[in-house]
């Protein structure tokens, strides 16, 4: 049945099929551990010779059902839920890389991920080179080293709203024998499925559109199952050589297309944790059931708001790839012809203080450290999410000092516009 389901049906019924007499909603298995009748059966679980559950830090039925739904939405072979989007990006990379390795990433990425790659991974011995995603393939190629193991980008960047040329990045990654990881948080699988354009691994902050209600923090790593790890086995010893902590088991040989996600659970979750609480996964699943409907409304509202801002003389610039004169319009039409997301980046005529005054004058629109929610939200990245970055780093990350990030919700668009208009009148 699962293979025949279309996107909207997967949102509602994917990942979990109740049997006769069972509850129709994904059950909340709020338990740390699971009972077995004999020691041998439990031992087989620890040796990865049998499927099943023994400790929620590694796997839990509620988490797995929701992860499977997201894997279906993205067209992947498997997925693992994490406790946050940051954890998802960390695990996606760290499941491949180790000390002495190097990654190449677009510089148009979320500030937290920018710090994760540029500062935290460096402490673990993993170097990172940031590239301009708009550069030519030849220019980006210069960033690669013999020890490069991963290429990373965001489908739609946070907060700059740049659209990644996924096919170009996939070509460059595969030319160098490494996988492409794409953070698909803003587009969601409703509007873009990166695997169809050559990406190998997809991540999400499920806190955002997938939840849609600001009720839980979470993330997910989804594997396409398409990358041939053994073709460049020397680059990926963690996946292609025996793991001493599992009696010499080799993940790719033992689990095939599921080798990547199996290693993430069996090794990283075992050693580092970061699994979501089953209750959070249950809440996430409730959000997923309406994702296809909400994304349509987000995009419709954002298009109208972007057009209004674009035509207002008090607005200096607008970045929204649904606008025909936007730099990324053609890429958006290629990868997301049915809509991009509800996030708009724009700047007002004036200085940094003008942006702050505008935000402080808003009434219905919320100033919060959040984005991609049912409620319309606003933030000044240079003062908030990217506050730790220097002016040079802000420039490198594509964050202008006057940039305002407006996350358009699913309220009545006329109410959203009324609030923006009255705030503009006060600057």
Segments from the language model and where they lie:
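Conserved PLP-enzyme active-site core in the AAT-like
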Residues: 2, 8-17, 79-311
């Amino acid at each position: 049945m699962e293979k025949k389901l279309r996107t909207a049906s997967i949102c509602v019924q994917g990942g979990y099929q109740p049997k006769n007499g069972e509850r129709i909603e994904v059950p909340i298995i709020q338990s740390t551990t699971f009972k077995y009748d004999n020691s041998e059966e439990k031992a087989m679980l620890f040796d990865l010779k049998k499927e099943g559950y023994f400790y929620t830090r590694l796997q839990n039925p509620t988490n797995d059902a929701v992860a499977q739904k997201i894997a279906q939405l993205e067209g992947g072979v498997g997925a693992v839920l994490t406790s946050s989007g940051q954890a998802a990006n960390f695990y996606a990379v760290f499941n491949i890389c180790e000390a002495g390795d190097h990654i190449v990433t677009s510089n148009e990425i979320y500030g937290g991920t920018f710090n994760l790659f540029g500062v935290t991974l460096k402490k673990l011995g993993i170097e990172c080179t940031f590239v301009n995603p708009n550069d030519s393939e030849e220019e980006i190629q210069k960033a690669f080293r013999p020890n490069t193991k991963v290429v990373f980008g965001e489908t739609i960047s946070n907060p700059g709203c740049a659209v990644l040329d996924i096919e170009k990045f996939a070509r460059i990654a595969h030319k160098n024998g490494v996988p492409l990881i794409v953070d698909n948080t803003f587009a969601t699988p409703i509007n873009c499925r990166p695997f169809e354009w050559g990406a190998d691994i997809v991540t999400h902050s499920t806190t955002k559109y997938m939840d849609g209600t600001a009720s839980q923090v979470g993330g997910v790593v989804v594997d396409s199952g398409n990358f041939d790890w053994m073709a460049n086995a020397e680059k990926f010893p963690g996946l292609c050589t025996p793991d001493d902590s599992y009696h010499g088991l080799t993940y790719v040989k033992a689990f095939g297309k599921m080798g990547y996600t199996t290693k993430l659970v069996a090794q990283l979750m075992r050693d580092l944790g970061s699994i979501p609480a089953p209750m959070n996964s249950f809440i996430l699943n409730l959000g997923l059931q309406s994702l296809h409907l909400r994304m349509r409304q987000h995009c419709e509202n954002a298009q109208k708001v972007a057009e209004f801002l674009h035509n207002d003389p008090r607005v200096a610039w607008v970045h929204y790839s649904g606008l025909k004169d936007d730099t990324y319009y053609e890429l958006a039409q290629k990868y997301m012809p049915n809509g991009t997301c509800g996030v708009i980046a724009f700047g007002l005529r004036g200085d940094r203080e003008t942006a702050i005054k505008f935000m402080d004058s808003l009434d219905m629109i919320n100033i919060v450290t959040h984005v991609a929610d049912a409620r319309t939200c606003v933030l000044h990245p240079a003062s908030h999410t990217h506050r730790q970055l220097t002016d040079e780093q802000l420039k490198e990350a594509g964050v202008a000092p006057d940039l305002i990030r407006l996350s358009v919700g699913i309220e009545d668009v006329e109410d959203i516009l009324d609030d923006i208009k009255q705030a503009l009148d006060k600057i």
